[in-house]
A protein has these predicted regions:
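Loop/turn-rich, solvent-exposed surfaces of beta-rich toroidal or solenoidal domains
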Residues: 236-277
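A short helix->beta-strand "capping" segment at the edge of beta-propeller domains
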Residues: 1-22, 283
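Asp-box/WD-like beta-propeller blade repeats and closely related beta-sheet repeat scaffolds
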Residues: 90-91, 97-134
Length: 324
């Protein structure tokens, strides 16, 4: 599928003794600042100056107090001086200004507190509404207006068979969980699956979401285990650990892929050393094979460098030079 392939070697750019990351999460580049989420430790935000190659600071605390976070899961570009965080556990989209972070202060504005606890990801669109992805009774996406009302539900997971369609849709959504990112113009969104091997690109309009591209190489292998009011769709040991992260620029989609069998490598199955780059039409551009496994990715807007965090053995910020 990918006619162009290249091997990349990493470079450490910042002294790893100047920072300590617990469990590296999503990353975002705003101007010359790289922001990285930390899922397991405090501070929850790490700031790197990738122009001068220095660690700026770590900040942000978990909690329910003013300007604290419960469980932030995504970073979303907002402007040259701000970004958004979706906090999963309090269903809130929060806006943060870089100026305040650079001054050592964490201050956010709550943009919207959503009604549903079923949203895994929420992004603002170009049409003054929001696109959400989550564990719904039908479909995989929904649009929400500025007044917190549902506009409608759209698209669905590409299940393997008619029999699978008879399963409770929330179980399907649990098995087909993945990660997403929205284009800089906020008019397109990409979904990649954590298990199986699925990538989908969708056009966003003011009142509808249309599937533009879909690639299915493998389906998630799972069982349904519902007891009482609880729901579960555990992945079997024969399942494939697929995409670990996805990052986007104006031109390209960078998908970080593992492809390992969980039964063979266990925890190491979630290590990823391959980046598959697509354009926004779904055309394959290039396959990068990395010299070290990484946890997440970010790319410069000009598509000249990829940044990642790799366990070397401690979580360390590294870069790869590319030429797209």
């Amino acid at each position: 599928m990918f006619q162009q392939s290249s091997s990349l070697e990493h470079k450490k750019i910042i002294d790893d003794k100047t920072y300590l990351i617990g469990s590296a999460g999503k990353m975002l580049i705003v101007d010359s600042i790289l922001i990285a989420l930390d899922y397991s430790a405090q501070p929850i935000l790490h700031l790197f100056d990738i122009k001068n190659n220095i660690y700026i600071n770590g900040m942000g605390e978990k909690g329910q107090g003013p300007n604290e976070f419960l469980h932030p899961t995504s970073l979303i570009h907002s402007s040259t001086n701000s970004f958004l965080i979706y906090d999963l556990l309090d269903n809130t989209l929060k806006k943060i200004w870089l100026d305040s972070l650079m001054a050592g202060n964490v201050f956010y504005e709550k943009i919207m507190n959503f009604n549903s606890i079923s949203n895994s990801f929420v992004f603002p669109t170009a049409y003054d509404n929001y696109i959400a992805f989550g564990l719904y009774e039908s479909n995989m996406f929904k649009l929400i207006d500025q007044h917190n009302n549902d506009i409608g539900y759209f698209a669905d997971f590409p299940v393997k068979s008619k029999e699978e369609k008879k399963i409770d849709h929330r179980n399907i959504a649990l098995a087909y969980q993945g990660t997403l990112n929205i284009s800089p113009d906020k008019k397109k969104i990409v979904y990649v699956s954590y298990y199986g091997t699925i990538i989908g690109i969708y056009d966003i309009q003011s009142s509808v979401i249309n599937q533009k591209f879909l690639l299915v190489c493998d389906y998630p292998m799972y069982t349904v285990q519902n007891e009482g009011s609880g729901m579960s769709s555990p992945i079997t040991k024969e399942g494939i650990s697929a995409f670990r992260d996805v990052y986007v620029t104006d031109k390209y989609i960078y998908s970080l892929y593992s492809g390992n069998k969980i039964s063979e490598l266990r925890e190491r199955a979630f290590e990823a050393k391959d980046i598959y780059v697509f354009d926004w039409e779904g055309n394959p551009v290039v396959h990068y094979h990395l010299d070290v496994p990484i946890n997440n990715i970010a790319a410069l807007p000009n598509d000249k460098k990829i940044y990642a965090i790799s366990n070397l053995p401690d979580p360390t910020l590294i870069e790869f030079e590319i030429d797209l």
